[in-house]
Amino acid sequence: MRNVMIVVEYDGTNYHGWQYQKNAVTVQEVLQKAIKKVTGEEVNLIGASRTDTGVHALYQVANFKTNTKIPAEKLPYALNSVLPDDIVVVQAKDVEDSFHARYSAKRKRYKYIILNRKFQMPTMRNYCWHISYPLNIEEMKKAASYLIGTHDFSAFKASGSSKTSTIRTVYDLTIEKNEDFINIEIEANGFLYNMVRIIVGTLSYVGLGKIKEDEVYDILKSKDRTKAGITAPPQGLYLIKIIY
């Protein structure tokens, strides 16, 4: 039996996240059905990151066990011929049997896009968070620096998380302005439930002057979710890299 790894890009707008749900359409379910059409096999597709409803992926990694004889390099063509236009397999390769898309991952990187201008941009409404008041980028950058390193991120975790440990290491957190857009990228060894979106929401409060930049350190140390900012909406979030 082979262990096949695939790299997937998707527009999360029309999906209830990655993970299979009984009464909703998810990315995992659509991909598993496509694999069955192509190989004739029911597979258990393991994703590196269980993205939420409306969240996008420019680099999602998944793996599945299969007996198919289709060469790995032909699989993307076969799968894309039966997949909808908003899910694309860009790479497939055979990997060792022990490879697990989720548990073998060492780091994950996300990008969050904010549109910071007076009016919404209709063509981007499903792909960014519109904030109409000007954000102070320099203050946001100062606040972000407190979050780099190994910390207890309980203050940036939504309720409903099944993870027991709340300690995570953030290796990189950058904020760049590109005309009307603000791009926030964060890389860590793992993320708690809604952690990226709560960090973005908190940094937006700093940018708006609702929270002082040095208060972010106090919020982090408090381990109290109620002290942090709002949870940023899902449509601005992109999974952009999995590092093994």
Swiss-Prot record:
CDD domains associated with the record: PseudoU_synth_EcTruA
Coiled-coil regions, chain positions: none
InterPro entries recorded: PsdUridine_synth_cat_dom_sf, PsdUridine_synth_TruA, PsdUridine_synth_TruA_a/b_dom, PsdUridine_synth_TruA_C, TruA/RsuA/RluB/E/F_N
Catalytic activity: uridine(38/39/40) in tRNA = pseudouridine(38/39/40) in tRNA
Binding locations of substrate: 110
Top-rank lineage group of the source organism: Bacteria
Enzyme class: isomerase
Listed EC numbers: 5.4.99.12
Gene3D superfamilies with a match to the protein in the record: Pseudouridine synthase I, catalytic domain, C-terminal subdomain, Pseudouridine synthase I, catalytic domain, N-terminal subdomain
Keywords: Isomerase, tRNA processing
GO function terms (MF aspect): RNA binding; tRNA pseudouridine(38-40) synthase activity
Function: Formation of pseudouridine at positions 38, 39 and 40 in the anticodon stem and loop of transfer RNAs.
Protein family: Belongs to the tRNA pseudouridine synthase TruA family.
Subunit (UniProt): Homodimer.
Protein name from the UniProt record: tRNA pseudouridine synthase A
